[in-house]
From Swiss-Prot:
The keyword DNA repair does not apply. Keywords: Nucleus, Ribosome biogenesis, rRNA processing. One of its GO terms (molecular function) is G-quadruplex DNA binding. Involved in ribosome biogenesis. Required for normal pre-rRNA processing in internal transcribed spacer 1 (ITS1). May be involved in the movements of the replication forks. Residues 1-58, 105-125 are annotated as: Disordered. It comes from Vanderwaltozyma polyspora (strain ATCC 22028 / DSM 70294 / BCRC 21397 / CBS 2163 / NBRC 10782 / NRRL Y-8283 / UCD 57-17). GO terms for biological process: maturation of SSU-rRNA from tricistronic rRNA transcript (SSU-rRNA, 5.8S rRNA, LSU-rRNA); ribosomal small subunit export from nucleus. Its main location: nucleus. Belongs to the SLX9 family. Residues 42-52, 105-122 have a biased composition (Basic and acidic residues). This is Ribosome biogenesis protein SLX9. GO terms for cellular component: 90S preribosome; nucleolus; preribosome, small subunit precursor; small-subunit processome.
């Protein structure tokens, strides 16, 4: 005699109940509105991450500067970049020709104003005319007479001079320049006619 299966009906009933509950749960989830707090806890950058990004950007900038990488020099060869940098350095140097032209313009303007004053004060005091002529008179200085044997345009290169590129040389050059500046200020020819003295020195150096 075969035994009867007593759990078949129970299993069928349990399966039906489970199916109904799953359908109900799905329907409830679909009917619920979206959670308003779902996007409140987004990922935020911490202070350590910000510090790391700043440090990396700073290190990359230093690396680019040390390698000579510039956005304006991107895509050109190293020799062309060196030529451009050399040209920029040369443009920053003082141009003695421009100073000479400015001094000549100053002298022309002074002579023009003098001519006008002389025409207006032709019947004036003669002592005033003598003082004006003495102011505009160019007196040659004998201080730089030793440079007369050199050809114009020749530059005398002094060896074993302190270099401006290191700290010790720059300090020594500053001391020498201050001494030379004081000597120039105390020079009698420079005190009598400063523009004329500057013009003579520039013409000697050209």
């Amino acid at each position: 005699m075969v035994a009867k299966k007593r759990n078949t009906l129970r299993s069928k009933a349990a399966a039906g109940r489970n199916a109904k509950t799953s359908v109900l749960e799905d329907s409830v989830l679909n009917e619920l509105p979206p959670d308003p707090k779902a996007f409140l806890h987004q990922h935020r950058e911490s202070k350590r991450d910000k510090q790391n990004t700043k440090q990396q950007s700073f290190l990359s900038q230093i690396k680019n500067k040390s390698l000579g990488l510039d956005s304006n020099l991107a895509g050109i060869s190293k020799s062309a970049a060196r030529r451009r940098k050399r040209k920029i350095r040369d443009d920053l140097k003082p141009k003695m020709g421009e100073l000479l032209t400015s001094l000549e313009k100053e002298e022309d303007l002074k002579e023009y104003t003098q001519d006008q004053d002389d025409s207006k004060d032709a019947d004036g005091d003669e002592q005033m005319e003598i003082s004006i002529n003495n102011v505009t008179k160019i007196t040659k200085s004998n201080k730089y007479g030793k440079l007369s044997h050199e050809l114009p345009g020749s530059v005398k290169i002094k060896k074993n001079q302190p270099s401006i590129r290191n700290q010790k040389g720059a300090k020594q050059l500053a001391i020498d320049e201050s001494k030379r500046f004081n000597q120039v200020l105390t020079n009698q020819s420079f005190q009598q006619n400063p523009f004329g003295s500057l013009r003579e020195i520039i013409k000697m150096q050209k």
